[in-house]
Regions:
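Active-site neighborhood of thiol-dependent amide/isopeptide-bond enzymes
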Residues: 215-281
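His-Asp-centered catalytic microenvironments across diverse enzyme cores
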Residues: 153, 251, 287-325
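Secondary-structure boundary elements
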Residues: 176-234
Length: 325
């Protein structure tokens, strides 16, 4: 009897397991549970240099950097008000710096001529600052603007100086005289001197130190630029007459920044011309309406005519020439 009960129990269990389950509205699907994949967040770099077209930006902790110097992977950059890295000659504060096409400051390149985006720059310091104004490089004259960009295919000083596509000035009388006088002024003066002190140092060079000798013929006063040609000849040969002395002082004055420089062709008492009126041809200088006579001082027949408000001896004027033209 016990054995029969056990068998009946097993049969009931089997029947229960084999009976399909029906819901009120049909079969109910067993839900499938799937795991959602975990997304690892991408970390924002602390420092990031981005290049978009020809623009370079720098981000620090996700924020664009502006008006700051930054060094990245060994290179130094400056990012301006718009966030762009500076390229070429750039003014930062009151100083100019030069950056290459990739925005890298041109460090440790003192004394080198570099080209960035077809512009020439002469690097003056190891921290990437360029030369500005007039300068001489490998015996050639250049001029650079306030950002260090050399003039190319342009003129200066009312066309007297022409700068070629290479940035070098055409080597004519004007450029050669400019370089000669620049070198002498640099040697004879110091930055601490006033303009008048510098002019006096140049005067002393002419009348005492240069070793000039009197000689040569008078220049052709009808030719344009005769005074600059005469000054260059005087400095190169150390020989000249009153026109040479006057023209040389005028060239120094121009280099020092004087603007009103005139050569006076006149006659003063003397016998050199053997003229019956007792006068002879002579040339002296007027700078900012002050009179200077370097040849008279050098020769000793009239000394100390430096910065006079009038010309101190009897004379008459034939013609006044503007040295700046």
């Amino acid at each position: 009897m016990k054995k029969i009960k056990i068998l009946l129990g097993i049969a009931m269990v089997v029947s229960v397991l084999t009976i399909p389950v029906h819901g009120a509205e049909g079969d109910t699907a067993i839900p499938v549970i799937s795991e959602t994949p975990q997304i690892t967040p991408v970390e924002t770099p602390v420092r990031e240099l981005r290049v978009e077209g020809n623009k370079i930006f720098y981000y620090y902790k996700g924020k664009m950097v502006r008006n700051k110097w930054k060094r990245y992977e060994g290179y130094k950059y400056y990012f301006g008000e718009d966030g762009y890295a500076c390229i070429g000659g750039s003014k930062i504060g009151n100083k100019a710096y030069v950056f290459d096409e990739n925005g890298h400051l041109l460090e440790n390149q003192k004394g080198k001529m570099r080209t960035v985006l077809n512009k020439k720059y002469c690097i003056a310091s190891d921290n990437g600052q360029p030369k500005t104004g007039y300068f001489i490089y490998h015996n050639d004259l250049y001029y650079a603007d306030s950002k260090g960009r050399c003039y190319q295919n342009r003129t200066r000083e009312d066309g007297q100086l022409y700068f070629t596509s290479s940035g070098k000035a055409r080597k004519d009388t004007n450029a050669l005289l400019k370089m000669r006088v620049m070198n002498l002024v640099s040697r004879l003066t110091t930055p601490e001197m006033s303009k008048n002190q510098k002019l006096h140092a140049c005067w002393e060079y002419i009348v005492d130190d240069a070793g000039f000798q009197y000689g040569g013929s008078d220049p052709d006063l009808k030719k344009a630029g005769w005074c600059r040609k005469t000054a260059l000849s005087m400095l190169n040969t150390k020989v000249g007459n009153c026109y040479g002395f006057a023209s040389t002082l005028a060239a120094f004055a121009k280099e020092l920044g004087y603007k009103k420089i005139e050569l006076i062709d006149g006659r003063t008492p003397g016998t050199r011309d053997h003229a019956p009126d007792g006068f002879t041809g002579h040339c002296w200088v007027r700078i900012d309406n002050r009179y200077y006579d370097p040849e008279a001082d050098w020769a000793g027949w009239m000394t100390g005519v430096y910065g006079y408000s009038f010309y101190p001896i009897r004379h008459y004027v034939k013609k006044v020439y503007n040295f700046m033209r």
